[in-house]
Amino acid sequence: NIGMTGCFPDHASADKLAEELSRYGINIVRMHYVSHRTPKEGYPFFDSFIEPVQLERFDYLFAKLKEKGIHIYFQLNIARKVSWVNGFVNAHLLPYYKNGIDNVNERMVYLQKKFHGEILNHINPYTGIAYKDDTSISMMELANENSIVHSWFSPKHKFTALVEPYKSEIIEIWNDWLFDKYGDMETLRTAWGKGTEANADEILPKSKNFKKKNIDW
């Protein structure tokens, strides 16, 4: 792994790193936590995760590794930080590293897609190739350890103690999915009861949207 600030070394350090890895016979590295480390100067736009100085250093390191025949395992999303600056209310109270919630929050999903599009279409000035077309990228990871199920059961993520407005948002999404799949409470109880009386409060948290669909439970 090359992680966090290690993804953005100065040119001299990048030269040395590529040389050392090659000397030890390493032919693939994982670029880890690329989008996690916030630059000192901040990001140029509220909805951007690309900062010019970091990007230039990343480009240079990538090119030097490529020159040495070292392939890249490119990790795009891990622990991406969000804050009130990006328009997220109570962001500092969200679960550890925002894992799980960024699978369902529309703005978080939008920002991930935006970042993916920007970085993959970016032409590295040192290689002359866009990352999406560079064959030295052997693997690409869209999201790392980001299962909503894992976050639900992990005490570290505290997903069951979401703050507003995120709690209501995910309840609405969950209830809409249940309604679309089962249509009524009797079918829902049968599917989830497994031969016993299903607890509706646990399966179906109360929400405005489900009440609007006139389902009496």
Which residues fall in each region the model found?
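Active-site mouth of glycoside hydrolases
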Residues: 1-217
